[in-house]
Amino acid sequence: CSHFEIDFLVLQDILNADHPTKIEEHDKYIVLILKIFYPNEHKEEDELDELLQQQVCLILGNNYVLTFLEKETDFFDDVSSALRNDVLKIRSRQTDYLLSVLLNSIMGNYISTISSIDDALEDLEEELLTITSGDDIGIQIQALRRQYMLMKKSILPLKEQYIKLLRAENLLIHKVNRA
């Protein structure tokens, strides 16, 4: 990372998988530390659905975007495919556009995951109203609410920081890519 002149403290943040969500501007680059969420596909049949999270770090510099993932994943395969096949004309645009495509993928993940949790909660609440046994529905509802709160804790700090980033006079984000 010496080639990109990434500060030592930023490298520590990248390596700390428990780092809170943040967007931080530096002289030569912008750092975004985010979480992605996905279901545990290796759970036992009798286990409750578990939401796993992984840290993603994006660094936007002059003519480059670096991505760091906590674990190997296919999360950005759609973006890689779009780059290879020039679907969104990403290569002919500035690097801040690539950053916006990556962020759009992460936001899509947030929306679909929240929607899945919401649907599961609705189903459980409906089931709770139609049966009297109670089974373990209360426990499942609590687990889903905890997943929801985990996501909320990671996503809410982004709102304020994202707005601040788009309003800043940062030369790395071009006016055409500010939403």
Task: Map each language-model feature to its residues.
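Peripheral, non-transmembrane regulatory/ligand-interaction domains of membrane transport proteins
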Residues: 1-177
